[in-house]
């Protein structure tokens, strides 16, 4: 109701809840790259810019729009027409060359970029991507990289406008006139990316995308990239730290004549049985209890989303199922995703593995994963287990995804599906089987991983008509939204029985008029 009232009173058009994640909606529909304004009988064109109250506002940088996250007061000031002031930042150039290898995803790329830029140190700086590698980098991949600017510490991660930008504007249904304007304006203003350009930056670094490996990030920080074969060892290292006594403990024991404390073998501890639907299961350290395809970081990217659907399809066809202790979910950032899943015939396979649609929003990425089944929560608490989540999000700090989940791993959507099948991060899924097929034969990740050609054929199902369909009535909302009655008033009409928002008492007891005093009075006397 607050959102709808705000829209009515400011003549703005608010987008109703349940439509998707604001950053993805902005990328797919709202962003224009170049805006126009009519004034004094003339039309002026100027670059699209954006400030938002969420750190991942930077996603729009992938569309050639300069934008970043700000505080609430700054955003409110901008709404009221005030400028956003800032010091001119350093600009770090990030040169991309080559192409991703077969089987490597945009998620693997962004985790590599995040690791490199964190090591470089770009806090408070702009990062601009350049190099001939951009010519083969789809806009969805650019948006994925731009989205994680907060994780690599930059104010923004900017991609200049080029033919790839125009292709995406056309695909997502922007008017032809808008696309023509973007091309003409950016070329005239020197904002267009030309092949072979070597801009001048404060500093720079480079990456050959052909060197990128299949990766996850974890267990606690998005910049801690781990190659897929090393995830099991990274988890064991985490356990060693958990079981290792502090220096204070070792010193105390040694001072009392002991020889210190030997670090126990983590494999010998950390398991608990639980019952579910008449079956007894054993939960161990490293068990994946949450596998979530979530977040605008990846759900805005058709290639990794289609890859997840294809992995699910191949897994179901081979008779694989998710492990019973894994809570799975699918929460895209826009309704376009479910449209292209249906068009590609992949929805049924995701559903069979438990990746049912739970809504269009941030969900698990911001900690809204919901409770785990009670028997599993009790088992975790009983044995103080170090369990895991695997999600296609952008942050994995301990306690963020779920308070009982100590290790959290960022991964591409297809790897999220794979770990739901494996049920643990304690095996090397690049070499060890995920399960057995109907004949009892082991099934490996390579057996269900789609080729680039298969992914491309699936991505070809994404059409402009899907964007037109989902955004045609985006401001109208559903029946519940339309049923909300909004009073026609200049200010908000406070409701005394509201449990959500109440009239603030800040101005109820303001002091009366200042008393008349003589010239010789000091502030102590006034107070």
Predicted regions and their residues:
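Functionally engaged cysteine thiol sites
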Residues: 11, 293-296, 333-335, 359-366, ...
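Immediate flanking context of iron-sulfur cluster ligation sites
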Residues: 5, 287-288, 354
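Hydrophobic, well-ordered secondary-structure elements that form the walls
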Residues: 297, 350, 417
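Glycine-rich and small/hydrophobic secondary-structure elements
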Residues: 348-355
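Mobile "lid/hinge" segments at catalytic clefts and subdomain interfaces of large enzymes
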Residues: 15-18, 24, 31, 37-193, ...
């Amino acid at each position: 109701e607050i959102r709808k009232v705000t829209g009515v009173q400011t003549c703005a058009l608010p987008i109703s809840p349940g439509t998707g994640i604001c950053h993805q909606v902005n990328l797919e529909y709202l962003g224009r790259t170049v805006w126009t304004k009519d004034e004094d009988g003339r039309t002026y064109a100027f670059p699209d810019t954006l400030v938002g109250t969420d750190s991942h506002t930077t996603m729009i940088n992938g569309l050639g729009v300069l934008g970043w996250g700000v505080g609430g007061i700054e955003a409110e000031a901008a709404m009221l027409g005030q400028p956003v002031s800032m010091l001119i930042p350093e600009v770090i150039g990030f040169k991309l060359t080559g192409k991703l290898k077969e089987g490597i995803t945009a998620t693997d790329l962004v985790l590599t970029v995040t690791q490199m830029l964190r090591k470089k140190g770009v806090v408070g700086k702009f990062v601009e991507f350049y190099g001939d590698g951009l010519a083969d980098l789809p806009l969805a991949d650019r948006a994925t990289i731009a989205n994680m600017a907060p994780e690599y510490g930059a104010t923004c991660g900017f991609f200049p406008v080029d033919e790839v930008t125009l292709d995406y504007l056309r695909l997502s249904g922007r008017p032809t006139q808008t696309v023509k304007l973007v091309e003409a304006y950016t070329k005239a203003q020197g904002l267009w990316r030309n092949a072979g350009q070597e801009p001048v930056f404060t500093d720079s670094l480079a990456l050959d995308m052909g060197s990128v490996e299949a990766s996850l990030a974890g267990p606690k920080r998005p910049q801690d990239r781990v190659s897929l074969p090393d995830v099991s060892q990274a988890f064991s290292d985490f356990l060693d730290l958990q079981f290792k006594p502090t220096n204070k403990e070792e010193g105390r024991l040694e001072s009392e004549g002991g020889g210190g404390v030997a670090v126990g073998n983590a494999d010998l501890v950390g398991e608990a049985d639980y019952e579910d639907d008449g079956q007894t299961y054993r939960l161990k350290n490293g068990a994946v209890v949450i596998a979530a395809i979530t977040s605008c970081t990846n759900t805005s990217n058709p290639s990794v989303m289609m890859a997840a659907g294809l992995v699910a399809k191949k897994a179901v066809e081979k008779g694989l199922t998710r492990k019973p202790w894994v809570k799975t979910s699918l929460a895209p950032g826009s309704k376009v995703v479910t449209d292209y899943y249906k068009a590609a015939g992949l929805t049924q396979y995701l559903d069979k593995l438990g990746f049912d649609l739970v809504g269009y929003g941030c969900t698990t990425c911001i900690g809204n994963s919901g409770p785990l089944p009670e028997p599993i929560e009790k088992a975790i608490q009983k044995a103080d287990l170090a369990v895991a989540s695997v999600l296609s999000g952008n942050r994995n700090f301990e306690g963020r995804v779920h308070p009982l989940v100590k290790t959290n791993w960022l991964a591409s959507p297809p790897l999220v599906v794979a770990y739901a099948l494996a049920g643990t991060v304690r095996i090397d899924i690049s070499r060890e089987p995920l399960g057995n097929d109907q004949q009892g034969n082991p099934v490996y990740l390579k057996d269900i991983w789609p080729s680039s050609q298969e992914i491309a054929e699936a991505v070809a199902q994404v059409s402009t008509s899907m964007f037109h369909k989902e955004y045609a009535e985006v401001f109208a909302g559903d029946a519940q939204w339309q049923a909300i009655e909004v009073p026609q008033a200049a200010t908000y009409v406070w409701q005394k029985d509201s449990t959500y928002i109440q009239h603030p008492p800040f101005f109820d007891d303001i002091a009366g008029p200042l008393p008349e005093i003589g010239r010789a009075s000091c502030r102590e006397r006034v107070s």
